C-alpha cells in the first residue's frame, strides 16, 4: 500500500491532478513534499550517473563501399588502403560471384558505369575481371578479387562488413562455396556480413550463428521476424515504429547513408548501432562531439522519457 501511495502521489505531482486513493488527511501535504523530495533526489542521482557513465552505446562508424570523400575507386584494394588510415570501425564492401565460381569485389550489377563494359560480373571469369580497368573520382585501378581484398584487410587489421550480392546467374552452390572458402577467416578476424537476400542470411546462420549477419531492408513497411543479427536500413525510411519493435528483440540496427548532421542526428535519436557513410571524418567528428559535449537538459529529458516510457 505504501508503494501504491507513493506512485499515485508521484503521478499527481507530475500531472498536477489529484488522484485519490483514500480520504484526504491533514498530513497529506507532508507526504506530498516527501514524494517531491524523493523524486528530486532520484532524478538528480540518475542524471549524475547518466552523465558520468552514459548507458548509450557509441555507434559504429562504417565506410560505404570502402571509400570516404571520393578518395578512390569504390570497392578496391587501392581505396581500402587509404580508407583504413581513417580507422573506421568497419568497411562496408560488396561481393559478387564470377562466371567461374570465384568472387570479386563489385557493387554494380553491370560493369558499364565503372569499367565501360556492358557485362555483368557473372559473365566474366575472375582472371578477366581482375585484368579490367575501372575508373571513378579521377582514379584508375583494376577490379579487386575478394581474396586480395580480404587478405589486405586482415593485414591492415581492418574489419569488414561484407555484403553478398546475388543474381539469377549465380551458381546453386554459391553460398556454400563462399562459406567453405572464407567462413573461418571471416569469423577469426571479426568481420561481419549482410545481404538483401534472406537466403544468404539463412546460409550464414546455418554455417555459424556466431558470425554477425544483417538483413538489408530497402523499405520500412512491415517489421520482419527473422533470426538475423540485425537490420541495415536506409535512414530516411526509418521511424519510431520500427525502432520500438526492434527494442523488443535483441537485434541491432545499421543505417545508410549518413552524410549530413541532420541524418546523423536522426540516426542517434533512433538509437542506430552503426552508421554507414561516404564521409567518415564528418561522422567521426559528430560522434566525438556528442560524447565530449553532452547537453545536460537533453540527456535528463531523454532519461525521464525512457523512465516513464513516453
Locate each region found by the language model:
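Phosphate-group recognition and catalysis centered on beta-loop-alpha active-site segments
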Residues: 1-310
Amino acid at each position: 500500500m505504501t508503494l501504491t501511495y507513493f506512485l499515485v502521489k508521484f503521478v499527481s505531482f507530475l500531472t498536477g491532478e489529484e488522484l485519490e486513493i483514500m480520504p484526504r488527511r491533514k498530513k497529506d501535504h507532508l507526504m506530498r513534499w516527501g514524494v517531491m523530495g524523493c523524486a528530486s533526489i532520484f532524478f538528480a542521482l540518475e542524471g549524475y550517473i547518466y552523465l558520468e557513465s552514459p548507458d548509450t552505446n557509441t555507434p559504429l562508424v562504417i565506410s560505404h563501399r570502402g571509400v570516404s570523400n571520393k578518395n578512390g575507386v569504390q570497392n578496391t584494394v587501392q581505396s581500402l588502403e587509404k580508407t583504413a588510415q581513417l580507422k573506421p570501425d568497419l568497411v562496408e564492401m560488396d561481393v559478387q560471384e564470377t562466371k567461374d565460381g570465384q568472387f570479386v569485389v563489385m557493387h554494380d550489377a553491370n560493369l558499364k558505369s565503372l569499367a565501360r563494359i556492358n557485362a555483368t560480373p557473372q559473365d566474366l571469369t575472375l582472371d578477366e575481371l581482375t585484368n579490367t580497368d575501372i575508373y571513378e573520382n579521377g582514379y584508375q585501378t583494376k577490379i579487386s578479387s575478394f581474396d586480395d581484398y580480404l587478405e589486405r584487410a586482415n593485414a591492415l587489421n581492418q574489419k569488414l562488413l561484407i555484403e553478398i550480392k546475388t543474381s539469377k546467374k549465380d551458381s546453386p552452390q554459391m553460398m556454400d562455396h563462399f562459406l567453405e572458402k572464407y567462413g573461418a577467416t571471416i569469423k577469426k578476424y571479426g568481420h561481419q556480413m549482410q545481404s538483401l537476400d534472406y537466403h544468404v542470411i539463412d546460409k550464414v546462420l546455418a554455417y555459424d550463428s556466431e558470425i554477425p549477419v544483417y538483413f538489408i531492408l530497402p523499405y520500412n513497411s512491415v517489421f520482419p521476424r527473422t533470426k538475423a543479427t540485425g537490420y541495415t536500413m536506409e535512414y530516411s525510411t526509418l521511424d519510431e515504429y520500427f525502432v520500438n519493435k526492434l527494442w523488443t528483440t535483441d537485434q541491432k540496427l545499421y543505417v545508410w547513408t549518413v552524410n549530413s548532421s541532420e541524418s546523423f542526428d536522426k540516426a542517434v535519436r533512433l538509437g542506430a548501432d552503426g552508421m554507414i557513410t561516404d564521409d567518415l571524418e564528418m561522422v567521426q567528428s559528430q560522434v566525438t562531439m556528442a560524447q565530449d559535449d553532452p547537453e545536460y537538459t537533453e540527456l535528463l529529458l531523454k532519461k525521464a522519457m525512457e523512465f516513464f516510457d513516453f
